[in-house]
């Protein structure tokens, strides 16, 4: 259900702006998207897991706030990021 260290390092390497970048908003958004996708798969077989569903909603809200920040500061970066992550635009 959680992300493996190797997968997280791969995401950091793919979305990092500089070599040692681990905390930029794009990297955080990519990691959150991976966690959200993992939880979504978990709910396909565990539909009564309401505690984890609340955690999923918290993660989705955190990702939405990060995407709003990116959109406010750099629209082209935002559009590129959502196309790479495969998520919809925020209204």
UniProtKB/Swiss-Prot annotation:
Database matches in Pfam families: Ribosomal_S15
InterPro entries documented for this protein: Ribosomal_uS15 (IPR000589), Ribosomal_uS15_bac-type (IPR005290), uS15_NS1_RNA-bd_sf (IPR009068)
Biological process terms in GO annotation: translation
Keywords of this entry: Ribonucleoprotein, Ribosomal protein, RNA-binding, rRNA-binding
A Gene Ontology molecular function term of the record: rRNA binding
Family: Belongs to the universal ribosomal protein uS15 family.
GO terms under cellular component: cytosolic small ribosomal subunit
Disulphide bonds in the chain: none
The protein's name: Small ribosomal subunit protein uS15
NCBIfam families xrefs: S15_bact
């Amino acid at each position: 259900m959680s992300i493996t260290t190797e997968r997280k390092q791969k995401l950091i390497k793919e979305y990092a702006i500089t070599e040692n970048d681990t905390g930029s908003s794009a990297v955080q958004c990519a990691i959150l998207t991976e966690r959200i996708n993992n939880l979504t798969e978990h709910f396909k077989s565990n539909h009564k897991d309401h505690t984890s569903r609340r955690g999923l909603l918290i993660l989705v809200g955190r990702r939405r706030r990060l995407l709003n920040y990116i959109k406010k500061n750099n629209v082209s970066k935002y559009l590129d990021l959502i196309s790479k992550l495969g998520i919809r635009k925020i209204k």
